[in-house]
Amino acid sequence: MWLKALIISFAVTAAFEPILIPFLHRLKFGQTILEDGPVWHKKKQGTPTMGGIGFILAVTVASMFFLRDVHDAIMLLCGVLFGLVGFFDDYIKVIKKHNQGFTAKQKFTLQTIASLLYAIYMYLFVGQTKTLVPFLGARIDLGILYVPFVMLVLLATTNSANLTDGLDGLASGVGATVALFFCA
């Protein structure tokens, strides 16, 4: 089911991004490069930013057709919250015409709030406290430790993607890998 949503969102993104990127370029929604950065980054000045809008919209709309219950909707909402953090981070960069949006502390705080809300929801309303140990097939009941565990997984996954992401559309490959992880 989630694989269908992933395939549809990939197709929509592949069709929509070639329209969105030139539009963002015309709006001058481009990346600002620091003067004290590496010399080879100078040529990347003005590279369109906020391309994640198309990806987040495509994933959200495609996923909405496959929601089975409120739990799926809450999981999707968590992803949208993380996407909004990225959107506003990029938006601040564009408005300030500087490469600094949120500070690392601000971004991490917002991500922590989103992951905490999702983890608490899973613990209190779904009653989920077990996790599957990869390659062993065993389930471990973490009890209340499920909350920080879920937070750690969400924060580690999203920030790994953020750290890997660059300026030249690397997020699409990283994003697809992360999406496959969440579909599993």
Describe the residue ranges of each PLM region.
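"…together with the soluble PPM/PP2C metallo-phosphatase catalytic core" -> "…together
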Residues: 1-184
